[in-house]
Amino acid sequence: MGLSEDLHARARTLMQTLESALNTPGSRGIGTANPTIYDTAWVAMVSREIDGKQVFVFPETFTYIYEHQEADGSWSGDGSLIDSIVNTLACLVALKMHESNASKPDIPARARAAQNYLDDALKRWDIMETERVAYEMIVPCLLKQLDAFGVSFTFPHHDLLYNMYAGKLAKLNWEAIYAKNSSLLHCMEAFVGVCDFDRMPHLLRDGNFMATPSTTAAYLMKATKWDDRAEDYLRHVIEVYAPHGRDVVPNLWPMTFFEIVWSLSSLYDNNLEFAQMDPECLDRIALKLREFLVAGKGVLGFVPGTTHDADMSSKTLMLLQVLNHPYSHDEFVTEFEAPTYFRCYSFERNASVTVNSNCLMSLLHAPDVNKYESQIVKIATYVADVWWTSAGVVKDKWNVSEWYSSMLSSQALVRLLFEHGKGNLKSISEELLSRVSIACFTMISRILQSQKPDGSWGCAEETSYALITLANVASLPTCDLIRDHLYKVIESAKAYLTPIFYARPAAKPEDRVWIDKVTYSVESFRDAYLVSALNVPIPRFDPSSISTLPAISQTLPKELSKFFGRLDMFKPAPEWRKLTWGIEATLMGPELNRVPSSTFAKVEKGAAGKWFEFLPYMTIAPSSLEGTPISSQGMLDVLVLIRGLYNTDDYLDMTLIKATNEDLDDLKKKIRDLFADPKSFSTLSEVPDDRMPTHIEVIERFAYSLLNHPRAQLASDNDKGLLRSEIEHYFLAGIAQCEENILLRERGLDKERIGTSHYRWTHVVGADNVAGTIALVFALCLLGHQINEERGSRDLVDVFPSPVLKYLFNDCVMHFGTFSRLANDLHSISRDFNEVNLNSIMFSEFTGPKSGTDTEKAREAALLELTKFERKATDDGFEYLVQQLTPHVGAKRARDYINIIRVTYLHTALYDDLGRLTRADISNANQEVSKGTNGVKKINGSSTNGTKVTANGSNGIHH
């Protein structure tokens, strides 16, 4: 047989096996998840009184964990720190309970080894980066049990963890929990010592709580009346898992419906032919699914009869539709629709992009998609917004793989575009279409840049997710420029997966990609996704059927790639990667045009053109090259800021070129008065359309737009105060530059400049007259807003909580300003002499008889050396700031914080590299570009202006 026949044969066998467990009389179900140390440890704790003695009921499970402790004292699981912590905590509790076991005299020593491991691991644990089910309840519960044995730990996030624990407890309605099934039954072991397990026997289903061995074990431990049903369930699971190793249990069993629905929906989504998969078997599955859906009145849970969830319900409804046993989505919508997204179930900590992607996919398969148009648009908006606001890839709370979210989001969003192309869903806006297109291309860009040399993206299941994503997004016309490379990548991924498909190796720890209390793998899922990835058509849909996306230029990405590809920083990057950045940049253009200007319409005139089309590339490419991509929203905020800086700076330059000292003194006073008034910028005065705005009105409008930015409102007063101060110093420094230029014109260029030293001038006036420093501090406020929004507290905190950190950040800003000033001067020498703008090489340190720089080449070389020095000082400063911030927020978060702030620095560094490339005035470089000498042609008669010539040298974000 060929590969296609083999794929269908594997799919057929998989579904027949699962269906047999579903319909065979007497079957208690099936589950192919790997056994877990965590759940096995809970079962090992179960004891009961027999003949007046306390006896452990499942001693064989304790023997298993006893024999599988690792050399460092831990039980590692998938190798992640959090799984090692949770596993080891549970096993340490079990060890302490079994310390009196005379047959294992080294238990105390093993317990000390586990304790030593935890003492170190808990100190390294970053709670804010943790995504495990109920970890904020489970870890405190286990720590409290250890307290009873005299074992305690101190660690940096101890108080934060217990505050989360107390907050969650305070929200629980115990009477409601005891009354009926809820998702909390899945993790009730976390409430040992809090919950009254005697009030829960009626919630048992087939001897278990939501198919969870750990909760069932906790119930047996704490209920005062022994329940034979629960004991029988645990014994049965141990028996089922005997082939996996001696006396273990998984995190979930049975998983019959979960495995059927997830496996079959994946096979359908990726074009497996149901006619080749035993149609009678599939029909029996459909009838059983419909039976349970009817019993649940249109919704169902992970296990029928338990808490309803949107994930299970949505996929079941979709399958019934494609298996010709349709059921209405009405009850599903009523149960799960929330104001801005669909919830998975009650009590969830946060919304899930994968759940909403599944809901969207399901509604798009309804017989009449337009009936649910408002819900479809709502979910699509939510999913697109998640991608819009996320840096890099989107991770989800149900799967550790960064590609799982990409797979489900791409399937749903591309099908949305397909349906829209058929004339459905007419209320979808052009803005949403644009955001969907950007989201999809973000996925493909990140995946292409992350493939490993062997063709994989991690384990086989993760590689399957990535390949399926590529197949879906390849349906978009936006991929045309990189389609050849895309197909090569897909072929290399298939070459990696095909031998694995035939070999069927046993699962390894790295295959545990599914998130529960610890991670786990599921054999049927690995098979289903592997078969799906090798079968999916490439592209999933004909690109001509995705016909309603806003058109984008097919030439601009090539121009951007060719122009910026000349820079040393980009030369090593392959052509496809530079083109990918070009496509991302081109997609951002309409988004920038949609944002209202932060300046006056009259001020904006003449400020548009090719330069603004180049701007997104200058933000996307450097960040991506460093492996620190920012969110689309963050990039847009930066671009809007640059546009506002450019327009404001341009207007002031052009209108102040003939200003007298008296004019400048008057404007300085107005600026100081404006920023000294605490009421300033709380409201904005209207300016009649029939006159040009005054200088102070332009400055006020610009400052107002930043200080009242909607994504900076939750920044602390200290951080916003720093932004306010930076804006004031920038405009005052601009006036000081104008005053210097007046003196320069009066004195003449041939006279030696007397006064402030070059060092002091570049570090005070020169650095302050750099718009990029405003951008850095504005990014600080955006970050502060994000931090305080996540905290959900009215007590707003500073991004940098200590005087040392604040000083270090301001030092980075100063070095950045000085670097920008020097770089601007280095690349503007000819322009500044022609226009009589003060430049670094006009200072006596460069022109004096003993300066050692008596030639233009020597002066430029000296200035280049200083520019390199300050650029390195900026890099070193940011790196040191990361190190000092790490103890406060954790290593990953510290790095993420600084990456957000550094975006504008990378943008300016690119300008510096452009200047070094041309070694001439940037405006001359732009003239070359417009003539086509650098391989970039004119488009529609407009030149590709890369910067502007100004009176005082403040060229937008670069300066």
Curated annotation (Swiss-Prot):
Binding site for Mg(2+) 2: D649, D653
Gene: PS
Spans through the membrane: none
Cofactor binding note of this UniProt entry: Binds 3 Mg(2+) ions per subunit.
Keywords: Antibiotic biosynthesis, Isomerase, Lyase, Magnesium, Metal-binding
One BP term from GO: antibiotic biosynthetic process
MF (Gene Ontology): isomerase activity; magnesium ion binding; terpene synthase activity
Residues that bind Mg(2+) 3: N824
Catalytic residues of the enzyme: D311, D649
Motif DXDD motif, residue range(s) on this chain: 309-312
Keyword Isomerase: yes
Disulfide bridge positions per record: none
Motif segment (DDXXD motif): 649-653
Record's protein name: Bifunctional premutilin synthase
List of residues binding Mg(2+) 1: D649, D653
Region described as Class I diterpene synthase: 543-959
Cofactor: Mg(2+)
InterPro entries, alphabetized: Terpene_synthase-like (IPR050148), Terpenoid_cyclase/PrenylTrfase (IPR008930)
Compositionally biased spans, kind Polar residues: 940-959
Species of the source: Clitopilus passeckerianus
